[in-house]
Curated annotation (Swiss-Prot):
This is HTH-type transcriptional regulator BetI. GO terms for molecular function: DNA-binding transcription factor activity; transcription cis-regulatory region binding. SUPFAM superfamilies: Homeodomain-like (SSF46689), Tetracyclin repressor-like, C-terminal domain (SSF48498). It comes from the Bacteria. The gene is betI. GO terms for biological process: glycine betaine biosynthetic process from choline; negative regulation of DNA-templated transcription. It comes from Burkholderia pseudomallei (strain K96243). InterPro entries: BetI_C, DNA-bd_HTH_TetR-type_CS, Homeodomain-like_sf, HTH-type_TetR-like_transc_reg, HTH_TetR, Tet_transcr_reg_TetR-rel_C_sf, Tscrpt_rep_BetI. Residues 31-50 bind DNA. PANTHER family: HTH-TYPE TRANSCRIPTIONAL REGULATOR BETI, HTH-TYPE TRANSCRIPTIONAL REGULATOR RUTR.
């Protein structure tokens, strides 16, 4: 009988191997066998924990999304209650170290592509999109009329995704300082008093 906690340890090991496999071989080159080889275990164990490749990608993305939510929660807790500070915290979480490593960025790209074809992954993407929009909208609504807050949240979410996507596709490390400056300048413009 396995030790208490062995399941969680094994799943984490396999998720790490999946991230590395997607980084090195892309999603098409990532198989249960390639993940098993990277983790030095049998393919049967990978199949036991995740069922198939889609289950493996889903579990890996749930892990990445938990990291994103933890970064968001941590950064919002450290920010002041001012909407500008809390918006900046949400932006910074999306460019957190847990979200911009090559393995994670390539996994995000693979996930987005697969989410157009797999209902379970599509649902995860919708949850993530709604969570981001809700967080942004709640902060903008503290200083802007409701309709304007929704527009601002949609615009900032698109900017975050666009900056992140361009960074992921650049083929070099993401310039988080430049991305944060652009997003924070956009927040400042949206919250500036109108004359």
């Amino acid at each position: 009988m396995p030790k208490l906690g062995m399941r969680e340890i094994r799943r984490a090991q396999l998720i790490d191997a999946t991230l590395r496999s997607i980084d090195e071989a892309g999603l098409p080159g990532t198989t249960l066998a390639s993940v098993a080889q990277r983790a030095n275990i049998s393919t049967g164990i990978v199949s036991h924990y995740f069922g198939d490749k889609d289950g493996l990608l889903e579990a890996t993305m749930r892990h990445v999304l938990r990291d994103l939510w933890a970064a968001t929660t941590r950064r919002r807790a450290a920010a002041s209650d001012a909407p500008r500070a809390r918006l900046r915290a949400v932006v910074a979480a999306n460019f957190d170290d847990t979200q911009i490593s090559a393995p994670v960025m390539k996994t995000w790209l693979a996930f987005w592509s697969q989410s157009m074809h797999e209902p379970t992954l599509r649902r995860l993407q919708r949850v993530n999109t709604r969570r981001l929009h809700s967080n942004l909208c709640a902060e903008f609504a503290k200083t802007l009329p409701r309709a304007r807050a929704r527009e601002a949240a949609s615009g900032l979410a698109a900017l975050i995704d666009g900056l992140w996507l361009r960074g992921a596709l650049a083929g070099e490390p993401l310039d988080t300082k430049a991305a944060l400056k652009l997003a924070n300048d956009y927040i400042d413009q949206l919250l500036a008093p109108r004359v």
